[in-house]
A protein has these predicted regions:
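Hydrophobic or amphipathic alpha-helical targeting/insertion segments
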Residues: 1-15
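C-terminal functional module detector
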Residues: 6-10, 22, 46-52, 58-73, ...
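Structured catalytic-domain cores with a bias toward divalent-metal coordination
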Residues: 2-3, 27, 31-63
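Binuclear metal-dependent hydrolase catalytic cores centered on His/Asp/Glu-rich metal-binding motifs
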Residues: 11, 17-33, 37-39, 107
Length: 453
């Protein structure tokens, strides 16, 4: 679990494919703070028949270091670096309790849903973390840029979600949030969602004045980052069977998705023969596998043919219904990063506006007096076929799915209501739970930096 000299987070989790043969001791920051040292260690184990992969997490707190354009020594990333990183790190964590690392409003100003559970600090500090180089969508775009310069793509990874609670207990439900680690944030008062008592607030102010803040003439505890934490997240894996071997292989091939805590399921395929696919067929998924590539894969250019994308999202029956399915595209134009969010499926029989690429409002609301939600609004599942209206043949790009639920009360609002308080005005009262797929890359390149064990 290394960090930079500026306290930028560079934590990784290492997953082994099996348990029959394991290293005697793990690699840690006592060995090196350089992630490249970890990869060399993993490569060495692989030569001994010990297969593993590493998953970076909390990139949002890396202060731009997780997805830099340079290596540890400050040299420009090259093909060898890209191949080594992708060989060892095919996945990245996109959401967890310490914030979501999809994107940031500063990076995606035209994405209305970018400001979701943003954790603005470097991990375990009060220092700000810069956005460029810290968020996953930006990393995918950076990967296109390095590949365009013939230096390979070190950021062609899939996504998972995780909890990072260190307790084997994940606080995934907004209405049942119990914090990250109980000794720190087990009560609404400690995590800053309700005003501190006079006694507790006074004691903290006397001993740690920076750990108290005033909001609308009310005193709240301000322990580092607690108010920004989220009830997240979950890793989704499409494996042939529920075995360690099958799940590991799915992780390795990046057939994975993430959710912010609810149990949404999402499928994503792309191909040149999917435009006639029958969305009602019981053989839809087998047809998609035969006719295209799935999340985490690369669709090769086929002359000027326009690919068709298949998305299928299923709601968690115990939470809010689905509001919309989106496909997010990233590409380079004259060397500049470009992105576009397309709504591709709307709930309640609504249709996407072809000019704005947005679904109309489906009318889903939340009553902040008791957190009740508008009834009979939303969809239990959404599936569709879609083609990119701005498709340019041969233009390198990535596409990934984001699924949005109807709004619900955030955990901090539930805390306030149950304590007889008003929700904090400086925190979001509601959120939209969501899921993200791993991308599909559209590419003319024959070198995709994929390593399949």
């Amino acid at each position: 679990t290394p960090s930079t000299e500026e306290l930028g987070n560079l934590h990784r989790n290492v997953v082994f494919s099996g348990t029959d043969k394991l290293p005697a001791v793990p690699f840690s920051r006592l060995n090196s703070s350089n992630p490249e040292g970890l990869w060399r260690w993993m490569d060495g184990l692989r030569k001994q028949g010990i297969e593993s992969l590493a998953i970076p997490h909390n990139s949002n707190g890396s202060n731009g270091a997780m997805f830099a354009f340079t290596d540890w020594a400050g040299n420009t990333i090259d093909q060898e670096y890209a191949e080594q990183r992708m060989r060892n790190e095919p996945l990245v964590e996109i959401t967890q309790v310490k914030g979501t690392s999809d994107t940031h409003p500063l990076l995606s100003p035209n994405d209305e849903w970018a400001n979701f559970e943003i954790y603005p600090k470097r991990v375990a500090t009060a220092l700000p973390s810069i956005a460029p180089g810290s968020y996953v969508r930006d990393a995918w775009q950076r990967g296109l840029a390095t590949a365009a310069n013939n230096n390979g793509n070190p950021y062609k990874f899939g996504v998972i979600g995780s909890s990072d609670t260190h307790t084997a207990a994940a606080p995934l439900e907004e209405d049942n949030y119990f914090g990250k680690v109980s000794i720190m944030d087990a009560t609404p008062e400690r995590r800053g969602s309700i005003p501190a008592s006079f006694l507790y607030g006074t004691l903290i102010r006397l001993g740690m004045p920076d750990m108290v803040e005033e909001v609308d003439d009310k005193t709240y505890l301000n322990f580092p980052g607690y108010k920004f934490w989220g009830a997240s997240g979950i890793a989704g894996v499409w494996a042939e069977e529920n075995t360690r071997e099958a799940i590991y292989d799915a992780l390795r091939r990046k057939e994975t998705f993430a959710t912010s805590g609810t149990r949404i399921k999402v499928r994503f395929f792309a191909g040149y023969e999917l435009d006639e696919a029958d969305l009602t067929s019981q053989d839809l998924i087998s047809t998609a596998y035969q006719s295209g590539v799935t999340m985490g894969g690369t669709l090769r250019v086929d002359a000027d043919r326009r690919p068709t994308f298949l998305t299928w999202a299923v709601a968690d029956p115990n939470t809010a219904q689905l509001q919309r399915v989106q496909i997010i595209k990233g590409w380079l134009q004259d060397g500049e990063h470009r992105e576009q969010v397309y709504d591709v499926a709307c709930s309640d029989g609504l249709s996407v506006d072809t000019n704005t690429h947005r679904c109309p409002d489906n009318g889903a609301k939340v009553n902040l007096d008791d957190c009740s939600r508008t009834a009979n609004v939303g969809a239990s599942e959404l599936r569709t076929l879609w083609q990119d209206p701005d498709f340019v043949p041969g233009q390198e790009a990535f596409y990934y799915v984001r699924v949005l639920e109807n709004p619900v009360c955030r955990w901090s609002t539930w805390d306030a209501i149950r304590s007889g308080e008003q929700p904090r005005p400086d925190l979001p009262a509601t959120i939209q739970e969501r899921a993200w797929s791993s991308p599909i890359w559209y590419s003319a390149s024959t070198d995709d930096n994929n390593f399949v064990h």
